[in-house]
């Protein structure tokens, strides 16, 4: 049971990290590349042996765990409403996606194409990012209310920044899929918040 909670929390931390990185890119035009790469690699792992193999290096999820603790904790610091909005938006889109077999099939085919492309190009090249962004735009964003990203107009109007943001939203939804597969439900965040925080804090101590 403790291991299951740890894996659910890992997946939720990945969702939070995607939201955090979206915010960084929208505000600054860039973000920590290794933290981003970790999440994008998770998108390409479609048939994992176990949950750990989706995010094998959990040190790269540090910001996600920290964000999870800060957003759910009872600390006096004000919550980041923007991050909460992104997380809720990704969870909602994943729920819409889960019931649409035709969309899931098309999405799987597009991800397979990116996998083949990733043999020849680095994940963070705009060639790959634009294709990941295209998957989000074509297959997912229209399933429900669009996630409105706030940031600096100077950056948000740049195609490369748009590609990064959409690729990260796709990565966040992939993490939502894993979280749900592991038994994660929204009510657990509401009613078992202390357990989630404790698991995230335990993970941070080990990083």
UniProtKB/Swiss-Prot annotation:
This is High frequency lysogenization protein HflD homolog. It is a peripheral membrane protein. Pfam families: DUF489. It comes from the Bacteria. Keywords: Cell inner membrane, Cell membrane, Cytoplasm, Membrane. It is found in: Cytoplasm; Cell inner membrane. GO terms for cellular component: cytoplasm; plasma membrane. It comes from Tolumonas auensis (strain DSM 9187 / NBRC 110442 / TA 4). Belongs to the HflD family. InterPro entries: HflD, HflD-like_sf. Disulfide bonds: none annotated.
